[in-house]
Amino acid sequence: MKIVVSGGGTGGHIYPALAFINEMKKRDERLDVLYIGTERGLESEIVPREGIPFQTIHITGFQRKLSMENVKTVVRFLRGTKRAKALLNEFKPDVVIGTGGYVCGPVVYAAAKLKIPTVIHEQNSVPGLTNKFLSRYVDRIAICFKEAEAFFPKNKVVFTGNPRASEVMSGNREEGLRSLGIKPNKKTVLIVGGSRGARPINDAFMSILSDVKAKPYQFVYVTGTVHYERVQEQMKSIGQPENVIVQPFIHNMPDVLSAVDLIVARAGATTLAEITALGLPSILIPSPYVTNNHQEKNAAALSKKDAAILRKESELTGDRLLEDIDDIMVTPGRLDAMKQAAKALGVPTAAEKLHMLVKEVAK
């Protein structure tokens, strides 16, 4: 089978694509894959490193206000579509799947116009502009939140979940504990703001650093690479509590997620797919800087089922964060109830479901 995958810009579009490719490879040793991205997006670093053939097109996203830049974007879209058609005619795929980000716009559109079977995968509860546009042309639309169904033609929608949920199930708890020196006899709270970190989360946690040392549980605090040095300087003056492990970045996240009891994080779609698959309770602080405020809507899908506490960045303080953590960790039965609620929302078989859908469309 030959497939073209396109998606990029952020890890939220790239990692589900890679998880899907890995699932396809497990089931078909002769699978032939071509990944089409942009030369500047994160995918240009990540995808070739995975040993996947990679081609690029030049495209930029639309701005949400009228501007001359949007005129240039239309021209780039038309050129990108022409380039995509050339790549598709040369590779001759059985199916094309787009996982979001503006790069998949011209690729999936070109495939539809060439009568090649097409699927788009929408990770968020509120779709972005690209997937809304493509929904008119594709054969099937895979979604991860039931709330996303309202934005698409009903006859095309299939609920699959996010394939990253399947990958995280392979996490090794013992390796997670060992790699960071986490004490196995203590409950653990993971605080993370994404690969680059989130300053408001860092500031909130640092403001309560002297208070957390008395807590009966331990913390794994991931600052983000950008903020690590600044946090280390602050730690020197305040003093690092024995029950706080500080890291700039975590490379083995599936292992670490398997080893912790509660996570404080942003509400990106991939993060939520991972934590619900594992049944991991969460305090979610959505980024207010994303398109359509989709992280808050993602988080709301969990909080209304009591799988998470949704805490807006505008109302985040260190004291409020510690209250939320204590509420979950100390209240009898609360942690277990949230675990069950999170697990009920998880789709650990998401990669298999997406694989089956793509195979069906490719026939």
Curated annotation (Swiss-Prot):
Binding site for UDP-N-acetyl-alpha-D-glucosamine: 10-12, 124, 195, 250, 295
Subcellular location: Cell membrane
Keywords: Cell cycle, Cell division, Cell membrane, Cell shape, Cell wall biogenesis/degradation, Glycosyltransferase, Membrane, Peptidoglycan synthesis, Transferase
Biological processes, Gene Ontology terms: carbohydrate metabolic process; cell division; cell wall organization; lipid glycosylation; peptidoglycan biosynthetic process; regulation of cell shape
Tree of life domain: Bacteria
Topology of this chain in the membrane: Peripheral membrane protein
Pfam families: Glyco_tran_28_C, Glyco_transf_28
Pathways per UniProt: Cell wall biogenesis; peptidoglycan biosynthesis
SUPFAM superfamilies listed in its UniProt record: UDP-Glycosyltransferase/glycogen phosphorylase (SSF53756)
Catalysed reactions, as listed in the record: di-trans,octa-cis-undecaprenyl diphospho-N-acetyl-alpha-D-muramoyl-L-alanyl-D-glutamyl-meso-2,6-diaminopimeloyl-D-alanyl-D-alanine + UDP-N-acetyl-alpha-D-glucosamine = di-trans,octa-cis-undecaprenyl diphospho-[N-acetyl-alpha-D-glucosaminyl-(1->4)]-N-acetyl-alpha-D-muramoyl-L-alanyl-D-glutamyl-meso-2,6-diaminopimeloyl-D-alanyl-D-alanine + UDP + H(+)
Name of the protein this chain belongs to: UDP-N-acetylglucosamine--N-acetylmuramyl-(pentapeptide) pyrophosphoryl-undecaprenol N-acetylglucosamine transferase
Species per Swiss-Prot/TrEMBL record: Halalkalibacterium halodurans (strain ATCC BAA-125 / DSM 18197 / FERM 7344 / JCM 9153 / C-125)
Gene name per UniProt: murG
